[in-house]
Amino acid sequence: MKYPDFSLENTLSGIIAGVDEVGRGPLAGPVISAAVIFTDRDTVIDGINDSKKLTPKCRQVLYEKITSVAKFGIGMASVEEINSYNILQATKLSMKRALANLNLELDYVLVDGNQPPEVKWQVKSIVNGDSLSISIAAASIVAKVTRDRLMEELHNKHPQYNWYKNKGYGTKEHLSAIGLHGITKHHRKNFAPIRIL
């Protein structure tokens, strides 16, 4: 398996942040973005990859390693913001907040995908960036673990939806629970199939 590396970062100079989001598709919960900067590219953390390719246990281990050596910022767009705007605008908002929470002046921002937020720094959009750039891949891990932990906390308040397991995604079990119990304030009211209930 080919792992992301610093090849993209090494074509640029200065302070470079990788940004990725998680939680665009679920029916419940916020969208979370993370921004990660490796100030010392000689630091090697084996196994960093797109978070979707990793087991939950592996993500947890890598999260602890990444956050102990890298600078990182977390940004969130709430369910209210997702309902008020749309998921694309809410995602961009969460990315901006993650970058702002770094509290650093940057030279470049590497963003996974092709719809980056408008920020004051130079931005490079990279499709499949979480499989190419180690900074973006690390951001995907930090964002995923952060959101998963949040959904597990929300599960304790609303166990009937089993968010501990499905993390708010539209599984058959989650949809069945919505049919039985209705929706909570944590559900995205403008997402199908909730919108048509």
Curated annotation (Swiss-Prot):
Pfam families in alphabetical order: RNase_HII
Chain segments annotated as transmembrane: none
Reactions catalysed, as given in the entry: Endonucleolytic cleavage to 5'-phosphomonoester
Cofactors (names): Mn(2+); Mg(2+)
GO biological process, one term: mismatch repair
Keywords for the protein's UniProt record, in alphabetical order: Cytoplasm, Endonuclease, Hydrolase, Manganese, Metal-binding, Nuclease
Subcellular location: Cytoplasm
Binding site for a divalent metal cation: D20, E21, D112
Coiled coil: none
Domain RNase H type-2: 14-197
Details of cofactor binding: Manganese or magnesium. Binds 1 divalent metal ion per monomer in the absence of substrate. May bind a second metal ion after substrate binding.
EC number: 3.1.26.4
GO molecular function, one term: RNA binding
HAMAP family in the cross-refs: RNase_HII_B
Family assignment from sequence similarity: Belongs to the RNase HII family.
PANTHER family for the chain: RIBONUCLEASE H2 SUBUNIT A (PTHR10954), RIBONUCLEASE HII (PTHR10954:SF18)
Designated name of the protein: Ribonuclease HII
Gene responsible for this protein: rnhB
